[in-house]
């Protein structure tokens, strides 16, 4: 019988530390709900003491989820622990995650503390946390660069103080699989407790070994894996949870362990994170990439047609990828469109479907057929516009002279107020973005601008992702439209809208 491996998702905390990623309040809540639907055991919803926004989003998630444990991060500071308590006290299963660095380089250069000081801090703060929480998780930051004898002392101190979950972070992605497994074996053999202790792995991908190290940790005695959807995170990212879960599923013969994830929700979860993070999943990404179940070679195609297992070790359906797509066209009616939405896993009320159907018909008039990816894109674009504080109303462009373009942009807020301005620039995009900046009265720096086609062909919809720097803060925006310039404007307006929402500001004019 397979043993249960718990999944601890830190997409909303460690994942959001990805450069350029800044989830809105609504996006965090939607992500948490999808993670619960996916079946993760614990969601690290944020770092409540770090900001008012983080506190409020953790609190909202704690009050919304019904089955998943909600965890908040805390340094070895009582005020941090208090913040987690206040944010998660209404959760069905509240958890606090207390951490302190333990490696020589961190003690000397960051904390300016001795080993004795660190041990005393662990004892004091884990003891305090245990007075407020039934479940306390402790992490010795940079554990894999900590001397093993001292690491054992740190963990034993935390366990004696009441921690029942011990997480071993490979903070800078430094370890390799045998070494990492050995750390877990040493801890499970050396640390004593009258309580059951769950050991957890938290791996970063700086050397490309986050997933393999996570699996090695299981062989060493870990019973929980921490990571993020799509592997997003600081620097090179974290262990991709979908890869860990499918590795355990497919190679159960070796690991003898399984997660409780609803694997059919995997692709949907990945797509949601990709959309909100503004990070496109690479086509060749394991499990959820567009090419994960594609076969180009004639030999491979022949083999798959004869027997799928010749070149596929898992089915697309296992992770929620449909292989029987029936495209819609301009003659398709409301009923067919509604049935397509259900088939794609969407539960959308009739009123919202009316607007989506209008968008579908507009696209169907321009394309020979509308694919599932087009439908997903319509819904994604609609969600973004519905959630936004401001959205693009109209865009007009005119050629001036000598390469200069003129743009007139009209933006509408949720209350129906209209804001309009115009500008010129050396090209359409520059003119559009100058006009939007004038509307919001902000000086911005465009850090990244990316265009992707939703499907193949010249009639494909365009997805535009932008990253802006506004008053020292990075925000991302997403826009989708058949017209690249419209999509570009929508993305830029959304980025400004996110900044305005986070700062509770109103634009002028």
From Swiss-Prot:
Protein name (Swiss-Prot/TrEMBL): 2-isopropylmalate synthase
Any one of the GO CC terms: cytoplasm
GO molecular function, one term: 2-isopropylmalate synthase activity
UniProt cross-references to CDD domains, sorted A to Z: DRE_TIM_IPMS
Enzyme Commission number: 2.3.3.13
InterPro entries: 2-IPM_HCS-like (IPR050073), 2-isopropylmalate_synth_dimer (IPR013709), Aldolase_TIM (IPR013785), LeuA/HCS_post-cat (IPR054691), LeuA_allosteric_dom_sf (IPR036230), LeuA_bact_synth (IPR005671), PYR_CT (IPR000891)
Alphabetized NCBIfam families for the sequence: leuA_bact, PRK00915.1-3, PRK00915.1-5
Assembly and binders: Homodimer.
Annotated family: Belongs to the alpha-IPM synthase/homocitrate synthase family. LeuA type 1 subfamily.
Organism: Staphylococcus aureus (strain NCTC 8325 / PS 47)
Gene this chain is encoded by: leuA
Pyruvate carboxyltransferase domain ranges (all copies): 5-267
